[in-house]
Amino acid sequence: MDGTAFFFTIFVWFLLISVTGYSIYVGFGPTSSALRDPFEEHED
């Protein structure tokens, strides 16, 4: 396997895992209590 393609693949996987982990942390972590819920703002 070409060295450049291998490191590019590792970089893309690391980027994908990092973004996914950060999204889960923001959505369910300690800072999630500060997020607003637009469904609770409307009373239909």
Curated annotation (Swiss-Prot):
Q: Which GO terms describe its cellular component?
A: chloroplast thylakoid membrane
Major localization listed first in the record, in broad terms? plastid
The cellular location(s) given in this protein's UniProt record come to: Plastid, Chloroplast thylakoid membrane
Output one GO BP term: photosynthesis
Sorted alphabetically, the keyword list is: Chloroplast, Membrane, Plastid, Thylakoid, Transmembrane, Transmembrane helix
Ranges that cross the membrane: 6-26
Q: What name is this protein filed under?
A: Protein PsbN
Q: Which domain of life is it from?
A: Eukaryota
Q: How does it sit in the membrane?
A: Single-pass membrane protein
Name any one Pfam family assigned in the record. Answer: PsbN
Biological role stated in the UniProt entry: May play a role in photosystem I and II biogenesis.
Q: What protein family does this chain belong to?
A: Belongs to the PsbN family.
Q: What InterPro entries would the database entry show?
A: PSII_PsbN
Q: Which organism is it from?
A: Bigelowiella natans
